[in-house]
Regions:
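Active-site-proximal structural scaffolding
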Residues: 3, 18-22, 42-44, 125, ...
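Solvent-exposed loop/turn segments at secondary-structure junctions
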Residues: 15-18, 56-58, 66-70, 103-105, ...
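A generic secondary-structure signal for well-formed alpha-helical elements
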Residues: 28-37, 53, 66-71, 75, ...
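C-terminal catalytic region of ATP-dependent kinase domains
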Residues: 124-126, 133, 187-235
């Protein structure tokens, strides 16, 4: 079962005629977490329900956990732990849940030098925004300048590997113009995840679309067969 909580989401999956894509993506992440070391620490879980409202059946929904900082959800340092005096202390002691989404619909947000949007999902202040922005931009600068080892010291690579594997297996094209791509900073490290929003632009049915647009998946699987590169540890 799922941990007790008062906040839940009813996903309509209205863009997905199979109603299954979100559940499949979350299921793949569960397999990774249960069989591999490291990786994404938490992703939403849920179950399908038939919703009846005022005696009227209104359809099939996916009842699942909401993405939020919480001991029974994403368990990272919560700026609101001190209810009477929140957001006190140095910015680096807080956990930051972020979403890369070109909808820019949060109050606290920033963009990297390469135009990747990051939206803070919780209320913040100017010092917290400055810290999160500096941390993420610092990693991006290191990667683009070829200082990979230094950048990797600030990243949980296993979570990024698992996150990207799920995106590739689901053939999610929305990473190109990011929608609902979550990440977070906690205790001086940046993590990928949790997963969200796979009911649109995933597992395309067009043969031409899949063959022409996902050559990386083919090369990734070839790496697995040859036991070369980073993929060998995940075979």
């Amino acid at each position: 079962g799922m941990p007790k909580h008062k906040r839940w989401v009813l996903l309509a999956n209205w863009n997905d005629r199979t109603l299954m894509r979100n559940a499949v993506a979350f299921g793949i992440a569960d397999v990774f977490r249960n069989t591999l070391s490291g990786g994404m620490e938490w992703n939403p879980s849920g179950q399908f329900v038939e919703l009846v409202y005022n005696g009227v059946h209104v359809g099939n929904y996916y009842l699942c956990e909401q993405i939020k900082i919480d001991g029974n959800r994403l368990d990272i340092n919560d700026p609101l732990d001190d209810k009477d005096n929140p957001y006190t202390g140095k910015p680096e002691v807080f956990g930051y849940l972020m979403e890369s989404d070109d909808g820019y619909d949060e109050a606290w947000q920033f963009t990297t030098a390469n135009y990747v949007p990051f939206l803070l999902k919780d209320d913040a202040n100017a010092d917290m925004l400055e810290y999160a922005q500096g941390f993420v931009r610092g990693i991006e600068d290191l990667l683009y300048s070829g200082n990979y080892d230094t950048a990797y010291e600030k990243m949980d690579l296993a979570s990024f590997v698992d996150f990207l594997l799920v995106q590739e297996l689901m053939m999610n094209s929305e990473m190109a113009h990011p929608k609902s791509c979550y990440s977070y900073i906690n205790d001086g490290t940046m993590y990928a995840g949790p997963l969200w929003d796979f009911d649109w632009n995933t597992l395309p049915v067009s043969k031409t679309y899949s063959e022409n647009s996902y050559d990386f998946t083919k090369s990734m699987l070839e790496d697995a067969v040859k036991s070369s590169g980073w993929f060998s540890s995940y075979k």
